[in-house]
A protein has these predicted regions:
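Short, well-structured N-terminal submotif of metal-dependent ribonuclease cores
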Residues: 1-37, 50-66
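Acidic, PIN/NYN-like endoribonuclease modules and their adjacent C-terminal/linker elements
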Residues: 2, 108, 112-139
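Active-site neighborhoods of divalent-metal-dependent phosphate/nucleic-acid chemistry enzymes
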Residues: 3, 47-50, 74-119
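A generic structural signal for short hydrophobic patches within well-formed alpha-helices
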Residues: 12, 42-45, 83, 126
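Residues that scaffold the ATP/ADP-binding catalytic core of kinase and kinase-like folds
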Residues: 14-15, 48, 86, 129, ...
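Residues at the C-termini of beta-strands that transition into short coil/loop
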Residues: 39-41, 79, 122, 138
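Short, hinge-like loop/turn segments at secondary-structure boundaries
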Residues: 52-56, 92-94, 136-138
């Protein structure tokens, strides 16, 4: 199978919730082998986990990240091609008076240059990016 989707932080976090959203879980199973994430999302996940105090929850999340996410989901880099698209797109959006967050812009760039559909629960964070396909698996 080839990659089709780039998962945002809130999608990759969903399986760790006490009561994960059933549609998200179904989609993750349906599209196993077709999903990737970005180094920016990996950073957000590791940062969030690392800020937690030493606890059972933190150890659970660390295992999830290292034994599930890291081993089963490709983590695509924010590379020169993504940085180029990001720079041009950020300038265009700022010229229109819009200022998307830098990390969200990086995630959008990785999805765009890899021709992937960005999957997120925060669709509004990605509105305005030129020709970016976005899906919300929570709906």
């Amino acid at each position: 199978m080839s990659l089709r989707f780039l998962l945002d932080t809130n999608i990759l976090s969903e399986p760790t919730r006490q009561h994960p959203h059933p549609v998200v879980m179904k989609k993750l199973q349906e599209h196993e082998g077709e999903v990737a994430t970005s180094t920016t999302v990996w950073h957000e996940l590791r940062f969030g986990c690392s800020r937690l105090p030493d606890s059972q929850k933190r150890r659970f999340l660390e295992r999830y990240l290292t034994q599930i996410v890291r081993l089963t989901i490709p983590i695509l880099p924010y590379d020169v091609e993504a940085a180029t698209w990001h720079g041009v797109e950020r300038a265009r959006l700022m010229g229109m008076g819009k200022t998307p967050s830098f990390p969200d812009s990086q995630i959008a760039a990785v999805a765009k240059v890899n021709h992937l559909i960005l999957v997120t629960n925060n669709v509004s964070d990605y509105q305005g990016f030129f020709d970016l396909d976005v899906q919300n698996w929570f709906q």
